Amino acid sequence: MDKILSGKTVAIDIKGQIKSYTEELKASGKSLKISSILVGDDGGSVYYQNFQEKLANNLGIDFEKIKLDESISEENLKLKIEELNKDDSVNGIMLLLPLPKHIDERAVTNLIDADKDLDCLSEVSVGRFYKGEKCFMPCTPNSVITLLKAYNIEIEGKEVVIIGRSNIVGKPLFQMFLNENATVTVCHSRTKNLKEVCKRADILVVAIGRANFIDSSYVREGAVVIDVGTSEVNGKITGDVNFDDVYDKASLITPVPGGVGSLTTTLLLKNVCKELD
């Protein structure tokens, strides 16, 4: 039995949906446009923006790559965001983080129009999300839920344990599992008896950024194991789960790379295709 939950495979299907949708739009004389803002020249952010651009272009989405000097003032960055908010041709805005230290990240992200906030960064977007109102879904948590559903893994009534309580993954994922009627426990650095808690999980999600932290002693026989973490070890991308050690014990498991991360950018671009939700 193949135990691998492949984000790459699921992403291929979603890309096909996006491509068909944008082709229909263009046939009617319409198009979608995303503006991606990069401040400075952080290597990881440059790579990610280029990857976004390539994927968007392949899927028929117009992509505006905005590169701003690292020394730009906070006021001028805010003016740029306000300009994009008012531009009716722009359907989605992405602001790559982190920002330079002299810029107040919270003040800037809160300026992004919630109806264009593809990454769900602003407090208005976050508020809509937690109140269950219509909004763009946070992409990494959405990737976890999308992957489970694509493989017809039952969530309702299941015991879910999430290791990690970040604002980007752990907290919104907790809410999304609640919305699916799971019983959810969130663990963190102060959790006592972590192994015992993890062993209760039907679905174990790990998002802490510590390479190979979770071994088979944390996993109950037959659990579904979702690895969200990415770290570089000896030049290779590695997850939070010791894949080789856990594989035999899990019923299904995500690889790193090739699992959750393979879906995130695709779902980010799907966000702008509102009719596909």
From Swiss-Prot:
CDD domains: NAD_bind_m-THF_DH_Cyclohyd (cd01080). GO terms for molecular function: methenyltetrahydrofolate cyclohydrolase activity; methylenetetrahydrofolate dehydrogenase (NADP+) activity. GO terms for cellular component: cytosol. Its EC number is 1.5.1.5, 3.5.4.9. InterPro entries: Aminoacid_DH-like_N_sf, NAD(P)-bd_dom_sf, THF_DH/CycHdrlase, THF_DH/CycHdrlase_cat_dom, THF_DH/CycHdrlase_NAD-bd_dom. Keywords: Amino-acid biosynthesis, Histidine biosynthesis, Hydrolase, Methionine biosynthesis, Multifunctional enzyme, NADP, One-carbon metabolism, Oxidoreductase, Purine biosynthesis. It catalyses: (6R)-5,10-methylene-5,6,7,8-tetrahydrofolate + NADP(+) = (6R)-5,10-methenyltetrahydrofolate + NADPH; (6R)-5,10-methenyltetrahydrofolate + H2O = (6R)-10-formyltetrahydrofolate + H(+). GO terms for biological process: L-histidine biosynthetic process; methionine biosynthetic process; purine nucleotide biosynthetic process; tetrahydrofolate interconversion. NADP(+) binds at G164, R165, S166, S189, T230. Pathway: One-carbon metabolism; tetrahydrofolate interconversion. Catalyzes the oxidation of 5,10-methylenetetrahydrofolate to 5,10-methenyltetrahydrofolate and then the hydrolysis of 5,10-methenyltetrahydrofolate to 10-formyltetrahydrofolate. Homodimer. Belongs to the tetrahydrofolate dehydrogenase/cyclohydrolase family. This is Bifunctional protein FolD. It comes from Clostridium perfringens (strain 13 / Type A).
